[in-house]
Amino acid sequence: MLRRDPRKPLAILRHVGLLCATGPQRWRFQHSCAEEHSNCARHPLWTGPVSSAEGTRQSPINIQWKDSVYDPQLAPLRVSYDAASCRYLWNTGYFFQVEFDDSCEDSGISGGPLGNHYRLKQFHFHWGATDEWGSEHAVDGHTYPAELHLVHWNSTKYENYKKASVGENGLAVIGVFLKLGAHHQALQKLVDVLPEVRHKDTQVAMGPFDPSCLLPACRDYWTYPGSLTTPPLAESVTWIVQKTPVEVSPSQLSTFRTLLFSGRGEEEDVMVNNYRPLQPLRDRKLRSSFRLDRTKMRS
């Protein structure tokens, strides 16, 4: 079930890039509004302010039905992954991430809002401290307990992921909401190895894994031009957010919360609330591949 976001009220200081909030944080590293604006160690990957003052197409966003426009020209998204290209799962110090050999041209996505073929690079999750929140995107102000991101790069236009990640139309990210429900058998393969990567910078080898098993059966989606939600916040992403969530069990999500932001020998810092603040839509067009039906969304 969709839940109203308990994190409001929330204000982002656009000029200094620091965050003030009541309730749960949209970034786990929260600083006083009176603090000097500086790039201090909010997070080991962080190199800039919480909010990009110059950015005009930042992510994530609150997907509002009133802002969504049905586009009959949006084709179905074509998804074809090579399970054998899965390499390892690791704790990045911000989330756990599954890496793939992206030299395989055939493993990726095309169609939908995309003009080129995009190769799969990695996927990761964002989640909250409880089952009440955790997704990066929201829908009419409602959030899910977690969100999956499958990250792909434009192999037609760019030589490698690094160049694509900061280039125009360089990345395509599929977002999938996770909601509480039935046990997810395919996800369990990942959950089973999480104890081996509890600490930051630890990894475990993975056998074949096809991440299409994590996608919903219904492939209706919203799409909009946006950015990475972690530094460097590059505005290189075509977002493809699935309308239909996938079900996972409470125990599976609880295992996510056993991971740590901290490394071995450091004070334990539980890995939760690893999501970015919502960003304004501004004048961007939010398109949908489906005709809007509110009654079917709230499930």
From Swiss-Prot:
Residue numbers bearing the N6-succinyllysine modification: 66
Organism (species): Mus musculus (Mouse)
Reaction(s) this enzyme catalyzes, per UniProt: hydrogencarbonate + H(+) = CO2 + H2O
EC number: 4.2.1.1
UniProt cross-references to SUPFAM superfamilies, sorted A to Z: Carbonic anhydrase
Disulfide bonds: none
GO CC terms, sorted: mitochondrion
All residue ranges annotated as the Alpha-carbonic anhydrase domain in the record: 30-290
GO terms of biological process kind: gluconeogenesis
Name listed for the protein in its UniProt record: Carbonic anhydrase 5A, mitochondrial
Binding of Zn(2+), residues: 124, 126, 149
InterPro entries given in the database record: CA_dom (IPR001148), CA_dom_sf (IPR036398), Carbonic_anhydrase_a-class (IPR023561), Carbonic_anhydrase_a-class_CS (IPR018338)
Listed result of changing residue 95 to A: No effect on carbonate dehydratase activity. Enhanced proton transfer
Family, as annotated: Belongs to the alpha-carbonic anhydrase family.
pH-related activity note: Optimum pH is 7-8.
Underlying gene: Ca5a
